[in-house]
Amino acid sequence: MTVRVGVVGTGVMGADHVRTLTGGVAGARVVAVSDADQGRGRAVAAEAGDEVVFHADPVDLIGDAGVDAVVVASPDHTHEALATACVEAGKPVLCEKPLAATAADCLRIVAHEVAKGRRLVQAGYMRRFDPSYVDMKRALDAGSIGDPVLVHCVHRNARALHFFTPEMPFTSAAVHEFDVVRWLLSSEIVRVTVHRTRSSSRAAARLADPRLLVLETAAGVTVDVEVFVNAQYGYDVRCELVGELGTVSLALPSTTVVRAGGAEGVAVHADFRTRFAEAYRLQLQAWVDAAARGEACGPSAWDGYAATAVAEACLRAQEDGTPVEVELADKPALYGT
C-alpha cells in the first residue's frame, strides 16, 4: 500500500519533510501541500511533482479524500487546531514538536484522541529514532550498565535565530531532552530546577544563556541538562547514561577524522537538520509504515503533552531557582501504563 501524504507547512522543516518523503521513504507519496505563504507552498509542491496539489486552506488538505495521512509542520500556534482536525477526520498525523503551544492545548488533543478511541497522533520527537539514542536505550534495557543513577545531557546550538524568545530554550530546545529522557528511562520527570549561569556576551539581551537544568524522575534518577543556544562553534548534542555497573554515551556523529598539520579533528554539524537527518528519515519511515498498517507508533499525544508540561514547569522554576513539581493529568488507558 502506498500512503498518500499531505504536508501542512512548507518552511524549513516542512520542505525538508517533503523532500525526505519523496526521495527517502518507501511506501509514501506526497500528494498535497499547504502553506499560508502561497508562493512558497506552490514552489514546494512543484518541486515534489506535477501531480502534487496545493491547498491554500490546510483544513481543505486534511479533508481531501485523496490524502491518507498528514504531516503538520506549520507554526506552533496552529498545531492544536490542525492535529485535532486530523483526529476528527480519522487520519494519522505526524505533528512537529511542540505538539501544541501549551500543555493545556496538548491535553485537549489527548482528549479528542481518547474520544476517538484510537491513536492517530505521533509527536515529532525524532531523537527516539536516532540510531545512537536507540543503541543507548537498548544497552540500558538489556542491563548492560545496571540500573541508571544519573543522566548528563548537553544541547548546544550555534546561535539563536532572531525570533528566539526567552521561553524557547525550554519549549523549543530542551523539550527534546525532556522527551528523550522520559523515553530512555521509562519514567516521568516529576521535579525541575533551573539554575541561572553567567550569561554569554553572545546572547541577545533578552536571553539568559546558557541555562543549567536539573530534572528528577519518578524513579529517583537525577538528570542535568545544559542548554546553550549561542554556543557559536556549531550544533552539539550529547547524552551519557550512568548506571550502577557502567556508562553508555552517544557516539560522535561523524564519519571521517581529519589528521593534518599536527592535529586531529572531526567536523561539527552546523544545525540539527544535518545532525539528525537520518533520525528524521527513520521517523517518517516508521510513521508511514504504521499508517499503512492502520496503526500508530513513536511518541504519542500523551508524550507531547508530558514534554510540554515539563517545559512549562521549567518556565516557573526559572523565576527564583527553587524546585518546581511537574503536574500531570491522569494518563488515559489508551496510552498504556
From Swiss-Prot:
It is an enzyme of class 1 (oxidoreductase). GO terms for biological process: inositol catabolic process. It catalyses: myo-inositol + NAD(+) = scyllo-inosose + NADH + H(+). Keywords: NAD, Oxidoreductase. SUPFAM superfamilies: Glyceraldehyde-3-phosphate dehydrogenase-like, C-terminal domain, NAD(P)-binding Rossmann-fold domains. One of its GO terms (molecular function) is nucleotide binding. This is Inositol 2-dehydrogenase 1. The keyword Metal-binding does not apply. The keyword NAD applies. Its EC number is 1.1.1.18. InterPro entries: Gfo-Idh-MocA_inositol_DH (IPR050424), Gfo/Idh/MocA-like_OxRdtase_C (IPR004104), Gfo/Idh/MocA-like_OxRdtase_N (IPR000683), MI/DCI_dehydrogenase (IPR023794), NAD(P)-bd_dom_sf (IPR036291). Belongs to the Gfo/Idh/MocA family. Involved in the oxidation of myo-inositol (MI) to 2-keto-myo-inositol (2KMI or 2-inosose). PANTHER family: INOSITOL 2-DEHYDROGENASE (PTHR43593:SF1), PTHR43593. Homotetramer.
